[in-house]
């Protein structure tokens, strides 16, 4: 799941500044501020998840966080249309950052908690590899989708972000299924 949430986050975050620049005429500096907002709410989400100490609450963090990230990512889609203000993407990215902030560290804690101490290094490596692979695969896939949909003008951004939403929806579904059996 960490590869999914991280890959979808990074991929969307790569395309949002380009969308704001191309569709809404924002300067690169203005468009780049969206990455700051996502980082700030990621930190807030991480802080919040660190305050959850009940086992039941900790088990829910990945599904709640993934759901929030999905909603926030979907909220950025309307900003791909010139008639909708680019600020919509900023608001959506605030929400998405909160979601990944809840999920990402909770998955690390969960992974290490179910691993014997002598295998923590392996688990940590596997989580890092999932992050890297998720990011690399989704960015590459999104680049292919964007190139294929480029003739659709601003709708090419919709294609990419919607694809990341589908991936997050899959992650949400898988996480909810795992929670039923763990």
Model-derived regions: residue spans:
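12-transmembrane solute porter fold
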Residues: 1-181
């Amino acid at each position: 799941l960490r590869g999914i949430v991280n890959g979808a986050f990074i991929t969307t975050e790569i395309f949002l500044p380009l969308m704001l620049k191309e569709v809404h005429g924002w300067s690169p500096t203005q468009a780049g501020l969206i990455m700051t907002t996502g980082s700030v709410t990621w930190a807030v989400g991480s802080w919040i998840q660190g305050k959850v100490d009940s086992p039941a609450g900790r088990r829910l963090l990945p599904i709640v966080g993934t759901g929030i990230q999905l909603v926030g990512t979907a909220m950025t889609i309307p900003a791909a249309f010139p008639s909708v203000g680019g600020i919509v993407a900023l608001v959506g990215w605030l929400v998405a950052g909160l979601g990944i902030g809840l999920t990402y560290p909770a998955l690390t804690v969960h992974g290490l908690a179910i691993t014997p101490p002598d295998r923590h290094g392996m688990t940590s490596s596997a989580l890092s590899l999932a992050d890297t692979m998720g990011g690399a695969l989704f960015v590459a896939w999104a680049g292919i989708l964007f190139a294929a949909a480029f003739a659709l003008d601003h709708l090419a951004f919709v294609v990419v972000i919607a694809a990341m939403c589908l991936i997050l929806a899959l992650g949400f579904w898988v996480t909810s299924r795992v929670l039923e059996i763990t």
